[in-house]
Design a protein with these regions (language model features):
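N-terminal secretory signal peptides that target proteins for export/translocation
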Residues: 1-11
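Bacterial N-terminal signal peptides
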Residues: 12-25
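Sec/Tat signal peptide C-region and signal peptidase I cleavage site
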Residues: 27-31
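Cell wall/extracellular polymer interaction/catalysis modules
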Residues: 32-238, 246-335
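A conserved hydrophobic position in a structured secondary element of the catalytic/binding core
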Residues: 243
Length: 335
């Protein structure tokens, strides 16, 4: 009799184990990755609305952060996440909020804008360029200028002199741009080799050389670069994470000498799963997947370009289309 009473329990336990094992073995999906331990104060910020963070993005970002804290790699009280499936340029000067700053110790959450990799159009060969609003193409190839989703840890910050620019009729300013190096793992492990990091979305255009021997930045002949300041927060990057200059100062300061984690969504598995679902005519919710609905409608389906496939194409393209000799920077006229 005792054996009979135990058997149903054993079968019940075994069935539960089978379910758990099946879930653990299945591909990562939005449905499986429900974050049950999201703090109550953070829950109102979770969702698909503007300024909110998708649940799967938050869950992975939190998991990465606490893993690195346990490993002793990170001691920063804050961590970062990016949802690169959301729109960047909303039009009419408005930018989408898809870079997230989360500090659980002081219960703060902030969403700001951030650019994505522009990709490239290799005329007559292949096209993996992205528009300003939504990213369709992702990848980890060197010189691809694409965003690669996955895990990163912030590294050292380097600040470099870019030149001078005019702020008023009688006043010039110096552009010193900081760059935070990211170190990746797995598919993003070549982040340092790709020079992937974070920086302000600003540069100097129409640069010429102006005589200014008293400048601490003057070259050996007494010249300094001078150009027009261009801010491109609503534009695209070479694969890096770019912020508006006003946001960048605060974000970079948070990272200085205090490494932390950055999780960028989507990864290649997510992209492949979404593409398969689109081909099958499945909705994202029905397939247990996540992609911003507005951008998915615009791009049709996303694509991941792995480095082992794309780098040989890029290398051949560079051999067939060598860059012209670099011209010397012209001397400024009357500036």
């Amino acid at each position: 009799m005792r054996a009979r009473s135990v058997l149903p329990s054993v079968v019940k336990i075994a069935s539960h184990l089978i379910i758990v094992i099946a879930l653990a073995a299945s591909p990562r999906s939005f449905a499986v990755e429900q974050a049950s331990d999201v703090p109550a104060w953070l829950a109102p910020n979770v969702g698909d609305g503007e300024g909110q963070i998708a649940q799967v993005v938050l869950q992975r970002a939190r998991a990465l952060y606490f893993q690195k804290v346990r490993e002793g790699v990170v001691r920063n009280p804050c961590y970062f996440a990016v949802d690169a499936t959301r729109p960047n340029d909303l039009g009419h000067g408005d930018l989408g909020h898809r870079f997230y700053v989360i500090c659980e110790s002081d219960r703060s959450f902030r969403a700001i804008s951030a650019g994505h990799g522009g990709g490239r159009d290799l005329k007559g060969i292949t096209d993996f360029a992205n528009g300003r609003r939504c990213a369709k193409n992702f990848g980890n190839a060197i010189d691809s200028r694409l965003t690669a989703g996955g895990a990163y840890v912030t590294g050292e910050t380097k600040t470099s002199f870019k030149g001078y620019y005019r702020v008023s009729a009688k006043q010039d300013a110096v552009l010193l741009r900081s760059f935070v190096q990211f170190d990746g793992e797995g598919e993003t492990e070549n982040a340092r080799q790709r020079a992937i990091g974070g920086h302000p979305a600003e540069l100097l255009s129409n640069v010429c050389l102006r005589k200014d021997p008293h400048s601490p930045y003057a070259d050996g002949e007494g010249y300094v670069p001078f150009g027009k300041l261009v801010e491109y927060a609503g534009g695209r990057s070479d694969g890096c994470t770019s912020w508006s200059p006003s946001d960048a100062g605060q974000i970079i300061l948070m990272m200085k000498d205090k490494p932390t984690t950055l999780y960028i969504y989507p990864e290649s598995d997510d992209i492949d799963a979404v593409t398969q679902a689109v081909r099958a005519g499945q909705s994202m919710s029905h397939a247990g997947l996540y992609w911003n609905a507005s951008c998915l409608k615009e791009i049709g389906s996303p694509k991941f370009w792995p480095k082992q496939n794309l780098e040989p194409i890029l290398a051949q393209y560079e051999r067939d289309h060598p860059a012209p000799p670099q011209r010397p920077t012209p001397i400024c006229n009357g500036r």
